[in-house]
Amino acid sequence: MVLLAAAVCTKAGKAIVSRQFVEMTRTRIEGLLAAFPKLMNTGKQHTFVETESVRYVYQPMEKLYMVLITTKNSNILEDLETLRLFSRVIPEYCRALEENEISEHCFDLIFAFDEIVALGYRENVNLAQIRTFTEMDSHEEKVFRAVRETQEREAKAEMRRKAKELQQARRDAERQGKKAPGFGGFGSSTVSGGSTTSMITETIIETDKPKVAPAPARPSGPSKALKLGAKGKEVDNFVDKLKSEGENIISSNMGKRTSEATKVHAPPINMESVHMKIEEKITLTCGRDGGLQNMELHGMIMLRISDDKFGRIRLHVENEDKKGVQLQTHPNVDKKLFTAESLIGLKNPEKSFPVNSDVGVLKWRLQTTEESFIPLTINCWPSESGNGCDVNIEYELQEDNLELNDVVITIPLPSGVGAPVIGEIDGEYRHDSRRNTLEWCLPVIDAKNKSGSLEFSIAGQPNDFFPVQVSFISKKNYCNIQVTKVTQVDGNSPVRFSTETTFLVDKYEIL
């Protein structure tokens, strides 16, 4: 048996993914696949067709074909057995036998095809072996990773212990009326998650560099951020110890890229034929001395129906809001029905909702100056010292039912004074020298982690650290409004539906 190519194509002969096992040009394989639909005889139940030069062995898969192109003298029974294995491989990687899904997983399919056939000849493998080979599962790699994770945990514990010692030394020095030595960025050792490398690199603060790159390295003058005082030797010894345990100490920019690359994206929503998107956006302005100047929140329920048989439905809305939200339905929605029974349905029950389009059926608005309504309070306390400012920032979650993700608190910094010296910190930080900002990053703020603080020192005046800006995203909405049930107008039978909830920031400032 000599297998020339394996391909998944449409019924019109358009190639979606194709793997050639012998040398063959793209024009040649596209021509063979384009000719394939014209050769099939719908009146016969054969699963192969032949031309003067090649044989097509195929299997229909809904709107697609799995096609093997072989030489004419190949064993047709072996070809059919190989075709069945190819057809079983595709559902392993694709959730649906559709063109978009095949294209999205084309490389996974090609890797699997290569495990089945090598140089035109069938390999003696089964489906389980193909799955194992493509996953490249290795016991040695698992052992190595386990050892690596243990070393990282030990290094983090050592860093936390060292940070506490340095912080205690600083407090003792302040009690005695002495200036505490700068401790660099070791406060960032309390970071949760991410690689150890990204945490350690924050302790290495770059000095101001000359603008001319090719010039020989020259000292640019002492930098306050590098004055580690009597503790400098201990810091160097600690970094050397981490290196001996297998840690790579790299530049701070590389560390930032590493920590950013490790962010895990949320999995895609599994959308049903009836899908609802609940979205809220908040605009908030607070004063630095306390007091809510303005808070405005806008929310909306967007309905999307992808199957016209579910066009005539009603949404059961549960409103547990106690903050005085103003609700407004779409003009085509029966307002009396919503007011009396909290049901969203069309005024004319014989009509259907639009299909394959997002329709806003309910929106709400909340505007207030009540401080107790602030979801996340931020207190920034800059105090002038002899060499600049000591800044303390605290956050506290006031809405315990919320879970805020990817929280970033951005503090402006004065320009031309170098990097800040970080003391205590919950979470991690990034210093953007181009935009002169310090970003305090917290992966999650919830009822278990509802408060935290950041301390840093830098030259400047108290007004230099405002306005403080906040951004976050949440999968729980602020105004507890949910769709609990969807039923059809006729028969009141329940309908499966999916919901996607997002609560995000439009503008969140402390002036």
Swiss-Prot record:
Biased composition range(s): Basic and acidic residues: 168-177
Modified residues (Phosphoserine): 223, 244, 493
InterPro entries registered for this protein in UniProt: AP2_Mu_C_sf (IPR036168), AP_mu_sigma_su (IPR022775), Coatomer_dsu (IPR027059), Longin-like_dom_sf (IPR011012), MHD (IPR028565)
Start and end residues of each MHD domain: 271-511
A cellular component term, taken from the record's GO annotations: Golgi membrane
Superkingdom to which the source organism belongs: Eukaryota
Swiss-Prot/TrEMBL GO biological process terms: adult locomotory behavior; cerebellar Purkinje cell layer maturation; endoplasmic reticulum to Golgi vesicle-mediated transport; Golgi localization; intra-Golgi vesicle-mediated transport; pigmentation; protein transport; retrograde vesicle-mediated transport, Golgi to endoplasmic reticulum
N6-acetyllysine modification, residue list: 233, 241, 309, 351
Expressing tissues: Ubiquitously expressed.
Function, in words: The coatomer is a cytosolic protein complex that binds to dilysine motifs and reversibly associates with Golgi non-clathrin-coated vesicles, which further mediate biosynthetic protein transport from the ER, via the Golgi up to the trans Golgi network. Coatomer complex is required for budding from Golgi membranes, and is essential for the retrograde Golgi-to-ER transport of dilysine-tagged proteins.
Oligomeric form and interacting partners: Oligomeric complex that consists of at least the alpha, beta, beta', gamma, delta, epsilon and zeta subunits.
Family in the record: Belongs to the adaptor complexes medium subunit family. Delta-COP subfamily.
Protein name: Coatomer subunit delta
Gene symbol of the encoding locus: ARCN1
